[in-house]
């Protein structure tokens, strides 16, 4: 075991907190009941759930996702931790959390930590406890792995600064795209003054922080609840574009609303899982492909159509009758073609500096999926299916 009998009470609280943490930033992780790095001889039932965060370059990292406390003084309508809801709660002190996590890391069970908390005694006091935990891990236990810290509503600017110095990533749960929608979820929170302000501070501070050579600046992320407040995709994507373009967020998570028993929203209908999928697709087009919210087609309710992904829909509306000459299109136009992403677009540009794209073999070398691009591109002035028939 990575804990002993003297730690049993702390560990029981730890297990409970970890099991309750699934609600927060749920889309960042995929869980495994028997992860391959689980080499301890302890029974699997004694080990808290370990989650696998996907790396941008492929592969995944085992992370622990947990809370300092599941007690909370906030009464957000959608949240399982809301004040007054009847369920078993638990709390750990910063040194208790740091000790248990460091032992899990030493045992090879985890390589990173995502730490959040319910709010008790205000945002400043709660943020202090998160920072204390991170400082113990970084200094006493010399932990140099991935650390994701939540920024609490009401935290002050110096706490944001210290969190950025300690963490690999920080996050603020906006939950809604604007104040009007937030009032339906958390009527006692201020969208601009309590939540967006934290992200603005974080972006400003990290531009001026001095990091060690090779150390990456901490990334910023947020989460929006989809389907609980009558918000439209138009609203969500306008806010998402602001967060990407002005505050340089790395990722926005769209959490599908699923009603929690014994909350004010328990009788609402769960959101269709296709809706957040379309939002993710549109979000990545804004972040990585140069799209803006005005490029998307919305239905009468202000939402993205569910039957087709937004990039294909844009191409159907704009490229089907005006296909793109692949030998002449600039980088930004290439990104608009279904099947071509940033990496492939750069390959095309590099290839064209020395050669001309003339054949199916050239397209295959560049990794261009013919089935996806054939309706939208020209090769030397001819549709690809016509050209291929001559080869």
Task: Map each language-model feature to its residues.
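Conserved AdoMet/S-adenosylmethionine-binding subsite of the radical SAM
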Residues: 98, 121-291, 296
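Residue-level signature of tetratricopeptide-repeat
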Residues: 351-352
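Short, charged beta->alpha transition segments
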Residues: 64-67, 95-106
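Flexible, acidic/Gly-rich N-terminal and inter-domain linker regions that tether
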Residues: 1-71, 369, 386-391
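Long, highly charged, low-complexity intrinsically disordered interaction regions
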Residues: 263-336, 368, 372-391
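Canonical Radical SAM [4Fe-4S] cluster-binding loop centered on the CxxxCxxC motif
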Residues: 66-95
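Short Fe-S-cluster ligation motifs
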Residues: 100-119, 282
